[in-house]
Amino acid sequence: MVSQCGRVHPREITQLYKEKGFSGIVVTEHYSPLTFTGFSRVFPQKRIDFYTSSYYEMKKYETEDFSVLFGMELRHYGTGADYLIYGVEPEWLKEQGNLMFPWEKKIYELMHSKGYLVFQAHPFRPYILRCNPNYIDGVEIYNGKTPKSENDKAYEWAKKNNKLMVSGSDFHTKEHIGRGGIITNERIKNNSDLIRILKSQDFEMIKSY
């Protein structure tokens, strides 16, 4: 895995999710100072092939019944806040500069110019700086690695600010398999389907307490 906290090979991840009955996965590796080291910490755009490598490896095991979609989990310099970006494509990412430099407003405007969605991930973890809700589309109101009390606060914050909601597994090890996600009435085959369904909120949240 690209993210330092990942512990499972991409091929095994796809197999585990297929066995669990999922019809797809969004690969959101950490795009953060912890992922890029040395020279690439300042110029991560020079190592986008490295950053996208897990996605392309998992893509090899995509089938008619199982989709592998690209996303990202972005963190700015000097903050612990993480942002899940849905809809983003590897080809577009290769054309960008260092996305850890722009602050939340500029990132929001940049992503919206392409039709992507920005969700704040696990916003009530102790070290997280919650963003200005004007600069996100949604909130991860359930995170598979986060205590219920913190997830409940995330739900209330999203509801108060009229934000889209999503559930995520935050998969790092085998123990996290299937802890979060969404159940939809139709299979999500690509990022266009994903964006449309996230905007509609026509799905059921997976929550595993």
Question: Which ranges hold each PLM region?
Answer:
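C-terminal functional module detector
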Residues: 24-27, 88, 126, 174-209
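Short, hydrophobic beta-strand segments that form beta-sheet elements in well-ordered domains
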Residues: 50, 117-123, 165-167
